Structure formats: structure tokens, C-alpha cells
A protein has these predicted regions:
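Non-catalytic terminal and boundary segments that flank Rossmann-like NAD(P)-dependent oxidoreductase
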Residues: 1-32
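Conserved glycine-rich cofactor-binding loop
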Residues: 32, 39-40
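Rossmann-fold scaffold of SDR-type NAD(P)-dependent oxidoreductases
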Residues: 36, 105-113
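Flexible cofactor-recognition loop at the NAD(P)H-binding site
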Residues: 40, 113-116
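N-terminal Rossmann-fold NAD(P) dinucleotide-binding loop
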Residues: 43-44
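The beta1-alpha1 cofactor-binding region of Rossmann-like NAD(H)/NADP(H)-dependent oxidoreductases
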Residues: 81-96
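Short alpha-helical oligomerization interface
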Residues: 117-126
Length: 126
């Protein structure tokens, strides 16, 4: 139960704000970001804006061929690595690989879309 009504944050940004507007004047040099769903729609533009602000962006992808094509010239190919969020083993493999060569993660954008499928459980109980 929510004890208080939600209140607007009055940031000046809204549904029609572009990622480049939100990041205008912000220097993200030396920062590392991971954008799930970073190769489609809003995710592509978010990845682009973060790179333009100086950020090193990683875009894990279920369909790496599509991601490589969509993010060509934006995100380096070596930063596009296979990860299927619906597969815990794939996620763990990504985490193991990512954490073995990236010292820190400054920004995490959980942008990947999910489909409302019938509830299922993994062997681990998720």
C-alpha cells in the first residue's frame, strides 16, 4: 500500500523529451554504462546519447547480429555481447565475462522490453 500520493519531480522533462536533451551539458567521460535493449527504439537513442556525452556503452543483446547492425558507428562491436534476459545461464555468462574486464559500472539502464508470457519458473525458482 502506498502511504503518499505520487508527486511530480518537476524536472522539466516529459514524454517527448529526447535523450540528448536530458544529457545536454553533462559530461560522462570515463563513465561506463550498460543499456539492456540498447539496440532498438528508445534504447538505440539512449545508447547514442550516452556515447555522445562521453560514456563507454555496453549493449548486451539477444540478437547480436541485429545489435551490431543497429549500433554500427555508435557502440564498438566488442561492447555488444550476447545475453538473453529470459535465460539465467546466458545472464550469468554475460555477468562473468563483463565483470572480468570491466572494473566498474556507473550507469545501468534497464530498458529491455519484456513480453507478458504465462508465468513460468526456472529450476532455481525464479
Amino acid at each position: 500500500m502506498i502511504s503518499e500520493q505520487q508527486k511530480p519531480v518537476n524536472s522539466g522533462f516529459g514524454a517527448k523529451s529526447e535523450p540528448t536533451e536530458v544529457l545536454a551539458g553533462i559530461d560522462l567521460s570515463g563513465k561506463t554504462a550498460l543499456v539492456t535493449g540498447g539496440y532498438s527504439g528508445i534504447g538505440t537513442e539512449t545508447s547514442r546519447a550516452l556515447v555522445e556525452a562521453g560514456c563507454e556503452v555496453y549493449a548486451p543483446a539477444r540478437r547480436t547480429d541485429v545489435a551490431l547492425n543497429e549500433l554500427e558507428g555508435i557502440v564498438p562491436a566488442e561492447n555488444i555481447v550476447e545475453m538473453d534476459l529470459a535465460n539465467p545461464i546466458s545472464v550469468q555468462n554475460f555477468v562473468d565475462d563483463f565483470s572480468s574486464h570491466v572494473n566498474k559500472l556507473d550507469i545501468l539502464i534497464n530498458n529491455a522490453g519484456v513480453m507478458a508470457c504465462p508465468e513460468m519458473r526456472t529450476p532455481e525458482g525464479w
